[in-house]
């Protein structure tokens, strides 16, 4: 009886969340493509969350492999540290490392605001002042080129006062066939109203990888399902007759973790003295009193077993995640990084998910993401070495003829290799 009651309440809560989800398209009125921008080509930037660099071959994503054979495939794409969803999606569209654009984790604390950001809190997700840099859709809109987003980190926020012309707030309710039809509808709008940059997002592979692990049949099914959806998407877009180029990326990979030997909070940490946002593969401690930082750090160094401890000031430079990099002051005072495949876990009555990401991508190859590109802008049958995801930004700006003056961390080296007319 108790189980039935619990199930009822779980279902009720789920239905309530679905009912509250905002599934309406947002349209910013009064915008038009300039005559110059109406002549530009089109880019659809697709993210398949958690699509590890080897999944396409491992699980037989036949459509994706076929398109990349006629286009470009990277050995892998290296995520920025930490290899987590929000920091890396935003790095892809800003060309900046997380420490430079401000989304330093999925959950973090901002000292100057005395407030915390959470990927699960619509209030913070939709507040533009949390986001640094100039995402691609903002750059395009500033130059009178219309954009659309069917989900991307930051696309629901008024970054620099700008939204995409067409966008949706994130939900997983709208059926994929409906989403594809909407993309086609966007591309069939009159030229003055038609978006030239569209972002599109798939969460399913990441969900399966977390819940079942990267080697599970459910993960294979998710990869193949997304591959079939991509075929539907490209077929629908082809009917428009427009010169559309595709860039398909992922934010990170996925790895198996040790669910039986997890790490608890080290005894040296008095949790009453620190603000500690959620974390498993990276734990950031923000001291309420700066005088507590050094003594706790020294105690942690003595307890250092199956994890590494750093101060913000002595993080390895290749992370681009230290005090000198921390433009917005959002990196923790003390950072605890578990040794792969260990994770921090603070829920004793249940095990963590078997699949995870967030580890050092230069030490754990499973963190590497995917990069595929095809369409009229790209060279054919080209395989390139691994590269950092901050280099995607210049690829898109070159295809669309967008100019940027702000300093970014990416370069045009990859774009020059893969574009027909860089």
Task: Name every feature range the model reports, one short phrase each.
Residues 45, 63, 225-265:
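Metal-dependent active-site segment of extracytoplasmic phospho-/sulfohydrolases and closely related
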Residues 278-383, 387-398:
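Active-site neighborhoods of enzymes that stabilize oxyanions during catalysis
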Residues 96-213:
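His/Asp/Glu-rich, glycine-adjacent segments
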Residues 22-23, 228, 271:
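Coil residues (strongly favoring Ser/Thr
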């Amino acid at each position: 009886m108790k189980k039935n009651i619990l199930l009822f309440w779980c279902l009720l809560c789920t239905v309530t969340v679905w009912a509250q989800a905002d599934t309406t398209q947002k349209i910013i009125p009064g915008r038009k493509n300039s005559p110059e921008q109406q002549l530009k080509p089109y880019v659809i930037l697709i993210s398949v969350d958690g699509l590890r660099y080897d999944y396409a071959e491992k699980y037989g994503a036949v459509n994706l492999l076929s398109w990349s054979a006629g286009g470009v495939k990277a050995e892998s794409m290296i995520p920025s540290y930490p290899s987590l969803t929000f920091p890396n999606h935003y790095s892809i569209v800003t060309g900046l490392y997380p420490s430079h654009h401000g989304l330093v984790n999925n959950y973090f604390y901002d000292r100057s605001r005395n407030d915390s950001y959470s990927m699960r809190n619509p209030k913070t997700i939709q507040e533009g002042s949390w986001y640094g840099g100039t995402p691609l859709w903002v750059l395009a809109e500033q130059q009178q080129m219309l954009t659309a987003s069917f989900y991307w980190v930051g696309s629901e926020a008024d970054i620099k006062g700008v939204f995409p012309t067409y966008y949706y707030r994130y939900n997983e309710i709208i059926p994929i066939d409906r989403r594809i039809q909407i993309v086609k509808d966007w591309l069939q709008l009159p030229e003055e109203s038609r978006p030239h940059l569209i972002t599109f997002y798939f969460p399913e592979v990441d969900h399966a990888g977390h819940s079942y692990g990267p080697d599970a049949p459910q993960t294979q099914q998710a990869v193949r399902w997304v591959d079939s959806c991509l075929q539907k998407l490209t077929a629908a877009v082809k009917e428009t007759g427009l010169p559309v180029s595709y860039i398909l990326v992922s934010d990170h990979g996925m790895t198996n973790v040790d669910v039986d030997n997890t790490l608890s909070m080290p005894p040296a940490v008095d949790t009453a003295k620190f603000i500690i946002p959620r974390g498993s593969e990276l734990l950031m401690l923000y001291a309420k009193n700066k005088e507590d930082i050094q003594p706790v750090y020294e105690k942690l160094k003595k307890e250092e077993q199956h994890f590494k401890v750093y101060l913000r000031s002595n993080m390895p430079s290749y992370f681009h995640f230290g005090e000198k990099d921390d433009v917005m002051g959002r990196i923790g005072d003390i950072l605890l990084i578990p040794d792969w495949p260990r994770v921090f876990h603070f829920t004793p009555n249940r095990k963590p998910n078997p699949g995870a990401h967030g580890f050092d991508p230069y030490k754990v190859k499973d963190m590497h993401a995917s990069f595929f590109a095809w369409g009229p802008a790209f060279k054919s049958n080209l395989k390139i070495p691994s590269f950092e995801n901050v280099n995607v930004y210049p690829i898109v700006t070159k295809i669309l003829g967008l100019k940027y003056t702000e300093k970014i961390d990416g370069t045009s080296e990859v774009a020059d290799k893969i574009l027909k007319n860089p």
